[in-house]
UniProtKB/Swiss-Prot annotation:
Function: DNA-dependent RNA polymerase catalyzes the transcription of DNA into RNA using the four ribonucleoside triphosphates as substrates.
Sites where the protein binds Zn(2+) 2: 810, 884, 891, 894
Organism: Rickettsia massiliae (strain Mtu5)
Name of the protein in question: DNA-directed RNA polymerase subunit beta'
UniProt cross-references to Pfam families, sorted A to Z: RNA_pol_Rpb1_1, RNA_pol_Rpb1_2, RNA_pol_Rpb1_3, RNA_pol_Rpb1_4, RNA_pol_Rpb1_5
Cofactor note (record): Binds 1 Mg(2+) ion per subunit. Binds 2 Zn(2+) ions per subunit.
Amino acid sequence: MFMSVVNFCGQLSNTQQFDQIRINIASPDQVRSWSFGEVTKPETINYRTFKPEKDGLFCARIFGPVKDYECLCGKYKRMKNRGITCEKCGVEVTVSRVRRERMGHIELAAPVAHIWFLKSLPSRISTLLDMTMRDIEKILYFENYVVVDPGLSILQKGELLTEEELQKAKDKYGEDAFTASIGAEVIQQMLKELDFSKLKQELYEELQTTSSEVKKKKLVKRLKLVEDFLESENKPEWMIMDVLPVIPPEIRPLVMLDGGRFATSDLNELYRRVINRNNRLKKLIESKAPDIIVRNEKRMLQEAVDALFDNGRRGRAAKNANKRPFKSLSDMLKGKQGRFRQNLLGKRVDYSGRSVIVVGPELKLHQCGLPKKMALELFKPFIYSKLELYGIATTIKAAKKMVEAEKSEVWDVLEEVIREHPVLLNRAPTLHRLGIQAFEPLLIEGKAIQLHPLVCTAFNADFDGDQMAVHIPLSIEAQLEARVFMMSTNNILSPANGRPIIVPDKDIVLGLYYLTLAFDNEVGAGMMFSDLAEMEHALYNKFITIHTKIKYRRNQLNAEGKMVPVIIDTTYGRLMVGELLPSNPNIEFKFINKQLTKKDISLVIDLVYRHCGQKATVIFADQLMKLGFKYACSSGISFGMDDMVVPESKSTHINETQLEIQEFEQQYSNGLITYGEKYNKVVDAWSRCTDRVANDMMKEIATPPVNDDPNHQRINAIYMMAISGARGSFQQIKQLGGMRGLMTKSNGQIIQTPIISNFKEGLTEFECFNSANGMRKGQIDTALKTASSGYLTRKLVDVAQDCIITEKDCGTDKGIEVKSVIEGGEVIVPLAEKILGRTAAIDIFHPVTNDLILNKGELISEAKLEQIESAGLDRIMIKSVLTCESTTGICSICYGRDLATGTLVSEGEAIGVIAAQSIGEPGTQLTMRTFHIGGAATKGAEVSSVDASYDAKVKIISRNVVINSEERKIVMSRNCELLLLDNNGNEKARHKIPYGARLLVDDGDMVIKTQKLAEWDPYTIPIITEKSGKVLFKDMVEGITIRDVTDEATGIPSKVIIESKQYSRGAELRPRIQLLGAKGEVITLSNGLEARYYLPVGAVLSVEDGVQISVGDIIARIPKESTTTKDITGGLPRVAELVEARRPKDHAVIAEIDGRVEFGKDYKSKRRIIIHPIDETMSIEYMVPKGKHVVVNEGDFVKKGDLLIDGNPVLQDILKVMGVEVLANYIVKEVQAVYRLQGVKIDDKHIEVIIRQMLQKVEVTDSGGTTLLAGEKIDRHEFDEINAKAMKNGLKPAEAQLILQGITKASLQTRSFISAASFQETTRVLTEAAIAGKVDKLRGLKENVIVGRLVPAGTGYFMDKMRKAAIKLDEENV
């Protein structure tokens, strides 16, 4: 194993062509065959002559010459003696590079266990020998003896004996009656004696007979290990080493420092310890030293080898003089500084430089400004060759001198060299692929790189001192790739959502907004013009301004492509933008004939790209930028104190709210509401107040004061910046001129007293103190967030890196159904947005005319979308990566459109990495918690009613209503939904109506927009009767199940259900209310059950014992917790929780079958919920903690997948109960909800790619006739292959169920051990792989980068394909 790892980290010469890498345990003979000689002395180099000592760790005879073609004693020098071995010093004359490749070895005087196989959990040695690791350690480290052969004694084989016990046994049975031994030798002997085929048979038989689950698991593990050894042809005794490899000296160098001291690699020190102890042990054995001394030396040798392989894994780590632990071989591979991540996945490259960036507004989109000095340094070799070619310099040396002197000819040559030679610019952190783009360099004076303003969004760059790196693609292929794939002009659309990313921002937006403003009473209003020159003339002579409303005759292309004149109302400013538009019938002037905000500009750029192509878009964007900058400058927009307007109505609103709050305080003192309810109401009232003040302020800012002075600023500058999308948000303006509003404490709880002042008025000391807490929390969150966001991205990339488009069509008929996302009655994401760029899974017909709209497998383009929308389809079957059936990778048809180009994705595209980047890149914008804007709380008022958002017809699903004494309709169903339908019967909105709500409309009613449909109390959950009768309290014992809680503040008592203590001989009390009829019998409800209402802990009673109540009355209320104690995991942690498939805190419980609910007998602190299915088969029981809020009542009918307990459901449960599609929909919905809150748009398909990677494995439930074991987890495709083989041989196929894995686990269990090792837990992965003799087929990106080949994506994919085809042809020809 050792050599494979070394070889694989060494440089590979071009002659070695390979397709896969295999890892094995190295046998002693193999180690000796690699070696060029035995290292017997611990010396390194001679401190006087600085030559390596003979037979030492740097010996030239073993490892090769120190200088090229020169032996150590200097007898043979130069090339002519190549290959000769010097007879005097024994050194072969060759290149010194061999000191990086040649290995040595140490013959150990006693065998030593390899610590990876001993201590890497689960310990392989202990599993094989079926002993505990502790016992194995006792034997290895010479604490206990082990019985190898019990002979005539009654001792057991494998039994451990201490020194005294051994002595007693010898006295009892005689010296030779049994054999017991100690140390690594005995372990080696025991491993040698294992007969794997026999052991396999025994384990298999035992597995069939045993019934204990724990034992089964243990047997399966052992069986798996035995099978691994059998298949890989590794011998178990190789886990104990007789010979130790010594890695090449150049890999563990010894360097001389200035002061004559030496710096050495820790490995040399660790090797020296091993050699010293080994030599001492040899001497002790030769001199027949006492057993106890020899044994101690053997133990020390074992410890020295342990430290060399993995320092600190067992016992105390070996430390140097400065008390710093030595860096062992394992540490060389592990972690961020290890070989994998530091040198193989991330390399430093030459031909690169970095400098500060400045803005380059006069550049074209494909250009960047490169400082002359920098270019001269970067392009040196190119300049030398050109100087020589033109005969300006005679030799390279002369050319070098000329460049150093910076002669004038050099600059001319440099100009020529860089012409059309793209350079790559990169800004760290590179969070997505647009963080590296190619530009054509322009030589500039100065020392800073100039960057085009429009690419700043993609780089996330600003000019406050950011630095960027420049890289030069050298080969012609690299230049070609840079130009075709990476040029900034080829990256107009964002790969995350397919929208333009080259959009004007900040100043440009402000300039364009100013330019397209139109004012009413301007000079020359209503004038008519026929061409632009005429208008320019009028503008120059001040007959009009750029904002004057005028009429203009403009020639436009119609649908047939002919020019037709139209008269339009516009302004000169808007016409200037209009002039830049490419002529196309689909791009009408109306798109820009308005006040252009950032959103509008983005839409126009998108339209231009879709209809006129890339070149037109680039030219348009560039011209737009120049225009925007020009007018941002000439508008002279600035703002002062007076632009922050404080609305006059502010004091009124505040006074009203304070009165409202006094009322709540009064209600609380009178005991009408609880503290939690009061808190909620106060927070709500202040939220509403803040919003009202903000709205009034917005109105005042938006309508500027009337003033006849022509030089007077007619529109508020701050308002202009916010409304145009240039800078700032209304949230910020609210705090400048309105009121700051409610603040949060650091634990996320909202402080009841808001900050009434704004920044213009200034905060009082107390307000300042109040807001500091939330602000600091925000600052700290930001600092912590960056790291966890980066880590999430890394895990996502790792899990998805081998997801590549490998074929055009996998031919599957499967797909997923999508519909628009409707929340709270509003369409949040329309269907069009979800299906654009996907492919249809079935033929799609018009529901009325039955015309074919889409063929199966056809891409849904913008044109097709219009047809789908006009047909009024509300759900569609599309293909998805989740249902793709390609064995390696994914097919184009299932993936759909490549968002960055707007066409069908091409083969070889690394969609996994793109998906990971798209989800990870906005990660830093996501909050750690959902509530903050500089500490200000953004909490909407609680929803307590539903209004109609359209004129529509009402449809009520699962309507179960009772009419109460006030003639109101009360909802009694737990899953009542109210739908609003349009004239065609298509769903426009959907609202969930909670239990206990008052319905104000009924099924089939027609409603108008804004009409109230239902209302309820948002702070409590009621328990309502559906029959009238007399109340009877059961099991309500004062102080045991019920308590009078007197509110401290008010002194008003109320009866509250409490946790019941064990009572009277263990009879469990279950507090409930029964309804009695006229004769005192218990009333029967409509579902056939008796009218018994069980009360949960914390319920507050609303009725007295013995009173008469009527239908729809509230018996008790369960208060909802105050807003934040039920902490919503928001932002980044929620995304991580979903993709890691963790169990959420306070998770929900879902019903696994359809059936009726019954509460069984409680058990200790748990409630028992039983679901009886309708067909009277097996009922299912759930045990839930008593404090949890159960959302069902006894007798309720629940459907499979309904929640029994509130909270976030566990993903594994959804998969088990509802299947893959529902699970995928849920994850997509939840992840999107987090990003949507931050205004980030990500295409669903990226999340689907990650989900596909999480669903790679299946768990075997029945092994059938295959070699698989029940409970074994195996790759889906491997499982299918094994089954196909079994069926071919006429055996029963195995059965398995899909399992969901978190991304970390999925990354570690990928098929490629190289990729897994470079991710996390390197030693464990490599240990496992070596034992199983795993083969890495090098299919993913990471493993290819690590072995230094082209990645099998993009152009590399086709190179790979061509190479394989060529090899196949050659084989056929042979």
